[in-house]
């Protein structure tokens, strides 16, 4: 029962990425105002802890399934007891909420997201129609959280919307890849309900993300360097999903899902460029 097992329980890399997203979101919103660094550090720690809470909860609720499908995970392998996992998850969220009190709006959002994470783990993992939207919201919300921490959410709302639609699209594509297993597990998902038409739904959501990505330039938040960067990303989005539209397949879905994840990170870089070279 070493610290490595607890890092595995919270999915350390995911927590670090979410924390980094909040920090970058705050940097963008503050236009690299280094006087806000303390607030950004607090926000990043809160996101790390609340994300860890959500990931630990997922393992707690998935114990029966993981005993069969992922017996190497910390709880089914008995490297961490179920009781200790629960205590640890509560400790994470309690600490995160306490730290979030540095900003009352951050505290309220941390409470909201903690409740959403709990509901997702306990109720909506088998209803992916709702669960996909929850995952997309949580992914994008880290940027707004960073913006709240520095007192400016204008730009981060746009980043949130781009991330939400891109991740929502990606989750549907991932479900298309997993459709056979989801049918066996009696999961509700858009691909199960709509079949190949779900690919067109995912593509439409991705088009929304592409259209929204131009808003920071159109509203005057960022300049031409941002526009050039984000148009490049938008082209990669469309190129990445086009083969799946022509020939829907599980392998194509896997490739498209990977491409969307990579390009979403590049969009974040475009926002950084736009903020720095405003």
Swiss-Prot record:
GO terms for biological process: glycerophospholipid biosynthetic process. It catalyses: sn-3-O-(geranylgeranyl)glycerol 1-phosphate + (2E,6E,10E)-geranylgeranyl diphosphate = 2,3-bis-O-(geranylgeranyl)-sn-glycerol 1-phosphate + diphosphate. GO terms for molecular function: geranylgeranylglycerol-phosphate geranylgeranyltransferase activity; magnesium ion binding. Its EC number is 2.5.1.42. It is a multi-pass membrane protein. It is found in: Cell membrane. Keywords: Cell membrane, Lipid biosynthesis, Lipid metabolism, Magnesium, Membrane, Phospholipid biosynthesis, Phospholipid metabolism, Transferase, Transmembrane, Transmembrane helix. The keyword Cell membrane applies. It is an enzyme of class 2 (transferase). Pathway: Membrane lipid metabolism; glycerophospholipid metabolism. The chain crosses the membrane at residues 17-37, 40-60, 91-111, 129-149, 153-173, 204-224, 226-246, 257-277. Its cofactor is Mg(2+). It holds the Pfam family UbiA. The keyword Signal does not apply. Belongs to the UbiA prenyltransferase family. DGGGP synthase subfamily. Prenyltransferase that catalyzes the transfer of the geranylgeranyl moiety of geranylgeranyl diphosphate (GGPP) to the C2 hydroxyl of (S)-3-O-geranylgeranylglyceryl phosphate (GGGP). This reaction is the second ether-bond-formation step in the biosynthesis of archaeal membrane lipids. This is Digeranylgeranylglyceryl phosphate synthase.
């Amino acid at each position: 029962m070493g610290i490595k097992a607890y890092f595995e329980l919270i999915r350390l890399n995911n927590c670090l990425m979410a924390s980094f997203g909040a920090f970058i979101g705050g940097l963008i919103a503050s236009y690299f105002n280094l006087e806000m660094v303390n607030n950004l550090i607090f926000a990043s720690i809160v996101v790390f802890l609340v994300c860890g809470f959500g990931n630990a909860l997922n393992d707690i609720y998935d114990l029966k399934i993981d005993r069969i499908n992922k017996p190497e995970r910390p709880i089914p392998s008995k490297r961490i007891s179920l009781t200790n996992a629960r205590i640890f998850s509560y400790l994470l969220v309690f600490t995160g909420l306490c730290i979030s009190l540095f900003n009352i709006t951050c505290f309220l959002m941390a409470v909201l997201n903690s409740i959403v994470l709990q509901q997702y783990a306990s109720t909506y993992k088998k209803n992916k129609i709702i669960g996909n939207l929850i995952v997309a919201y949580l992914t994008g919300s880290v940027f707004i959280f960073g913006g709240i921490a520095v007192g400016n959410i204008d730009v981060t709302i746009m980043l949130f919307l781009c991330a939400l639609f891109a991740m929502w699209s990606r989750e549907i594509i991932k479900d298309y890849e997993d459709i056979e297993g989801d049918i066996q597990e009696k999961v509700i998902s858009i691909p199960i309900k709509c079949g190949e038409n779900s690919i067109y739904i995912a593509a439409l959501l991705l088009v929304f993300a592409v259209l929204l990505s131009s808003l920071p330039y159109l509203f005057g938040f960022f300049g031409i360097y941002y526009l050039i960067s984000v148009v490049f990303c938008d082209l990669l989005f469309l190129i990445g999903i086009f083969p799946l539209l022509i020939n829907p397949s599980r392998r194509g879905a896997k490739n498209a899902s990977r491409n969307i994840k990579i390009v979403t990170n590049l969009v974040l870089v475009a926002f950084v460029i736009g903020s720095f070279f405003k």
